[in-house]
Amino acid sequence: MPVRPDLQQLEKCIDDALRKNDFKPLLALLQIDICEDVKIKCSKQFLRKLDDLICRELNKKDIQTVSSILISIGRCSKNIFILGQAGLQTMIKQGLVQKMVSWFENSKEIILNQQQSKDEAVMNMIEDLFDLLMVIYDISDEGKNQVLESFIPQICALVIDSRVNFCIQQEALKKMNLMLDRIPQDANKILSNQEMLTLMSNMGERILDVGDYELQVGIVEALCRMTTEKRRQELAYEWFSMDFIANAFKEIKDCEFETDCRIFLNLVNGILGDKRRVYTFPCLSAFLGKYELQIPSDEKLEEFWIDFNLGSHTLSFYIAGDEEDHQWEAVTVPEEKVQMYNIEVRESKKLLTLTLKNIVKISKKEGKELLFYFDESLEITNVTKKVFGGNKYKEFTRKQGISVAKTSIHVLFDASGSQILVPESQPSPVKENLIHLKEKSDIQKKLVNPLELGNSSSQDEITTPSRKKMSEASMIVPDTDRYTVRSPILLINTSTPRRSREPLQAINSVEKAVSKTSESGMDYAASPKSRQSDGRKRWNNRANHNKTTAVIQNKQYEDNESPDQNFNEIEDTLSNVSSAVGKVDKPVLPGVLDISKNTTHSRWACWTPVTTIKLCNNQRSRALPGDTCTQDTGVNKKCTKQKSVSDDDSEETQKGKYSKDVIKCNKSDEAEFCERNIQEQNHPKYSQKKNTANAKKSDWHIESETTYKSVLLNKTTEESLIYKKTCVLSKDVNTTICDKSPSRKSKRNHTKSRKELMSELTSCELEEIPVRENSKGKRFTGASESLINQISRRYNPSDSMMSTRKLKEPQDGSGFSKKPDLQFNKVQRKSYRKLKATVVNVTSECPLDDVYNFSLNGADEPVIKLGIQEFQATTREASMDNSLKLVKNHDEHDPFLKTKDKRMLSYEKKTLLSDTETECGCDDSKTDISWLKEPKTKRLMDYSRNKNTTKYKSRKSRSSMEKGQPRPTMVLNKNSMKNDYEVVVDGRTRLPRRATKTKKNYKDLSTSESESESEKECSYLFKDKLPTKEETIHSRAQTKKLPEKQQKVFNSEALKGQPSEEQKNSSRLREGREDSLCLSSASVSRSSSSVEVMRCTEKITERDFTQDYDYITKSLSPYPKAPSPEFLNGNNSVVGRGQSPRISETSAMCVRKSYSPASGPPFSPRHTPTKNNSVVNMKKANSVINNQRTQHCNSYSDVSSNSSEKLYMEPESPESCDNHMQNKREGNHAASPLSLSSEKIEKMWFDMPSENTHVSGPSQRGSKRRMYLEDDELSNSNEAEVEEAEEREHLLSKKRCQWENSDQHTFKTSLSTPDFSVPKDWQQELQGAGMFYDNISSDYKRKTDSQHKIMDDFTTKTLKLTQQHLMAMTSQAQGRRDENVEKFQVTLLDELEKVEKDSQTLRDLEKELVDIEEKLVQKMRAYHRCERERFRVLKTSLDKSFLVYNSVYEESVFTSEMCLMKANMKMLQDKLLKEMHEEEVLNIRRGLQSLFKAHEGNDA
């Protein structure tokens, strides 16, 4: 416990606070109870010290300290004495009131700085100041006069100032009215001066706009108290400009003040109309919980008035007080005390319910809810919202998600909290689209009929901007500013009439609802009317249906890659995609920041599987907290789902609609340009960009519209594709950086880097898009030009790279076509994986003359950028482009497949899953050629999320393969297989195939399904031998951000798997192989660390996508219908020879995907060897045997991709491990130059990779394959191998290319279907296998050795570098420690010196204490002596004065007095007796006389 300070030390406490800034004694003084009889003595300087202290603290704005000082003075004021006189009176004479005026003025400055903010500390300080003022006011008449004269004007000025908080003004008015109530008679003259008259007039004006009823009452009361009733009649007209108000004021009587004041103020507030700040409504009844509140008992009070104070944001009313003295009790409910309020109608009464945050007590009644019943006709809703805010309104509390409905509906809240339902395309301002919740439910009902909704809901309730109708009928409404702007825009997803999508899960208002697209491709939600909101920044040309939606972020439009993306694919596909893009672009809403891409998405989204969309939506909802772009993506994905559902049936219809919306382009590269141009035309800005792009280069890789759409879907899953390039650049750019680094190293990778750059540029463009259309258009143009330049640079490999890749240049284009598909598939997976940003760029530099001839489109390699992790997806885009080309050619060969392929291609473009699904596989020859030509281009595929991306992409690849009609991606993969080098380089795109193999059913991935099935078959065959490669691929899928070199290596490996066309172009393939080998070695080294991840991913992906892609292929892909039946029948189903090329293509795509950089990074060392083996196989693909082996490798890669996906999806099973071991053994035995059996050949292939591999590649590959097979074909592994051998022989006899494809199928089929047969001729085709094997083995060994050297060098340098850093770190740390020790030593010495000084001080004090002690002892002795002498004198005096003498004297006196008293008493006794005797004698005499007289009378 602290020492209790003496109350006499008040002045000392003030001194300590003033001089030492020590307030502890003063604060301790506040804890002491002060008795009334205690006197606190202070000096004359006390007031000066007090004033200095308070002024200093006020200048410092130390509110708490000032409040403590005022409380201390107030408590001790009556006990302070200065020079023996009352302290307060003395201080008043010294000028205390004047000093308090200065305190008040300083306090007012603080109050004005606070303005209307409510600061409890300031309010407490003002209250303490007024309390002290009232003490002074009551102390004496002099104090009253000074206070009235000094403070009444100050308080009036405070009340007039509108900047002061209402609570402070109310407190000041209360104190002033108390003063005026006890004003002396002679003080009225103080209130009669001109200054006060002016202030009173201003106070009268203040009544009109004060905004608080209590304050109004206080002002009226002050005016009445400051003037007499007679004078009030005169001044009323000066105070109020309107006569009827002045007359009403004059009617106020002091005896009826409360009721008269109510009448007056109701009149004043009512006259102001809408400008009034206080709304007063009569209340029928009021309750606090279950207790009813009574109206004050006053005859003149007719109503129970409730005041809604807009100025102070409070609700106030008066009730009957419990005590008889107080008939009126004021109750005020501030806004901060209200947790929620609700207004509803009950029994023809309007009930206002206020739910308070804490339990309150009113008139001894407690409760937490205040209930007010009003007449139903009173409009209190708006007023209540103005007082308590719209956010606390129970009915309109912001919802975290949208109610479930067939169509996604966004419920947005405007600033007032009102709900608004807005269709996706709705551009109208927030205020214009207010819709009640009931209307929301109605709209949801209307969504069942999209047409009706588009016509009625969009037009009647909400003015929707005119926008291009999309065959998908998907509307994308980017609402990135939804929360920031609180735009009441509700995205209405129109559901297709054919397939009503099950209710969407609740989507956060931040999330963008995905509009469902009808199979017919109609955008029902879009209304023909276009409406531009000036409040919201929109494109001026929104009315133009061809415009693409742009994402406005931070009031800036960001360029979307989709508008810029241009498909090199089939004309129909282009037209479909472009139309879809154009339509989707229109839906941009004024409040939406992020999506110009949405337009492209809608169609892509339609291609996206329904399951995928849901996943994207959910993921997106989680990722959406900040990204509206993600919302838009979600919308696109939903559309994609719808479209994918109706993919097979309405594909053609949608395509036709797209073509209607978008100008159709030729099948040539110009078609791609046209498509992009159409997209640009759809959006003026895009049109500008298109023109620039076309002028710059007709062959520059344009982002595929479809690809972009699928990217948007992916973006929906994560976050918006171009959310200020925060998402895209953060992940995609990072991926791009990873990819770019390899691309810079090799021009081959240059394509991938270019694609990445395209995605980056696109994201940048999206960010940079100005809010205004003109600026945005310019930026689109600039962005498109830059993209074109970047793409052209990437497609133009360096001279050194050109030597090896020029031959493959056309193949590279097709390789990119394949890549895009793979990337596209990956993109969809990424969307499942919640990819934050996905950019899909599809570019083609070579014509699309031959579906399988990528040489035609070698330069036109579609680039698909998956912005989630990297723009490596760009490589896939290239693959996609090639695949699209292949599909186109294949469609030419097979009209049915062509039509479906086109639809699927458009879908694939949108979905990014259709790359492998395109039916280019029909033309084996073309596929072979395209594969051979395309391999040069490296695929930029980014799988930011390995697991999801891998699954999803693999799924698509498999589906396309199974169908035997690989989608553009499939074709690209085939071509890549044939173009061993480049396609394998694009192997990253293979990763989606692995994912396709995984057993996830994505209905929209129909194309992917066929591819994935084909991949499965091939992967099964190769799985035993190439599991390692699959793992490698899968690991890449996980890593997703492999450098371009690795990606190229994988792509080249995949291309190796395509021997038929490679045999034709053996020389070019060899060159490509060399390049790919170099890349593969690099990628192997890099990806080796991620092998285990790949395995898990493979497993998981394999399972999920194996199941899902089949389902998806059946449901969505029209292509799979022809070849898919075989694939769809089961992974074990046998694929026909005609389908074998497709299968091989699919396998190739799978291989690409497996080799995709995304899968590459996760590779473990064993995966790396597989990768190298693939590369070696690619190199040897130049020869027929090489081509065949390359085909096997491709099949293996497909299998490996699938198995890698499987590994990713599920842990390796013992069976898979066993199969793997068997495969390794078989592969090792198969190392023999030629083998009569297909099994032996496969073994040779795998053995060769194993030899080239650092680790036993064949066994590793086999294990991967086994992993993939373990679900479907572990039991049939031997039969599968036999069948594989047979099928290989048969396919080789038919056609090496077809044979390779069939081999892939055979592998896959053998794994999946033991009943597949292979021709006996097959062995004859492999006569050159030994030579091919030797070449591959030597090349691979050389590469392996070089890699080992590089790794050794890297290890040595790393060790040295690490040692250097460790030494530097150690030295720095030691130096730091030494410095700290020295500092500590210095500090320690200083403290020791101080200790010595303190010790000396203590010794001196001790001496002083000894001296003092001696003096005290002497003084005490002297005192004792004096005391003893005093006692002696007193005793002597006492003895002399009393004792014997007194007793004797008193005894004599007593005796004499007693004798005298006795004598006197005897004399008195004698006298009395004598008188008594005489009286008796007299009485007897009288009696005798009367007796004698009576006797004498009788006798007479």
Curated annotation (Swiss-Prot):
Residues modified to Phosphoserine: 457-458, 487, 500, 509, 518, 527, 646, 650, 741, 914, 1115, 1117, 1124, 1133, 1140, 1144, 1156, 1159, 1164, 1183, 1213, 1216, 1232, 1275, 1277
An annotated Gene Ontology molecular function: DNA binding
Residue pairs linked by disulfide bridges in the UniProt entry: none
Transmembrane segments: none
Phosphothreonine modifications at: 464, 496, 608, 633, 916, 1168, 1313
PTM per Swiss-Prot/TrEMBL: Phosphorylated.
Biased amino acid composition, Basic residues: 948-958, 990-1000
Main location: nucleus
Top-level division of the source organism's lineage: Eukaryota
Tissues and organs where the protein is expressed, per its UniProt entry: Detected in testis and spermatocytes (at protein level).
Subcellular location: Nucleus; Chromosome
Coiled-coil stretches noted in the UniProt entry, renumbered to this chain: 1388-1429
Recorded phenotype for the gene knockout or disruption: Mice appear healthy, but males are completely sterile, due to defective meiotic chromosome synapsis during spermatocyte development. Testes weight is much reduced in mutant mice. Females display reduced fertility.
Keywords for this protein: Cell cycle, Cell division, Chromosome, Coiled coil, DNA-binding, Meiosis, Nucleus, Phosphoprotein
Keyword Cell division listed: yes
Pfam families, per the entry: SYCP2_ARLD (PF18581), SYCP2_SLD (PF18584)
Region annotation Disordered: where it falls in the sequence: 512-548, 796-820, 940-1010, 1029-1084, 1208-1234
Subunit and interaction comment: Component of the lateral elements of synaptonemal complexes. Heterodimer with SYCP3. Interacts with SMC1A and SMC3. Interacts with TEX11.
PANTHER family on file: SYNAPTONEMAL COMPLEX PROTEIN 2, SYNAPTONEMAL COMPLEX PROTEIN-RELATED
Family statement: Belongs to the SYCP2 family.
Entry protein name: Synaptonemal complex protein 2
UniProt gene name: Sycp2
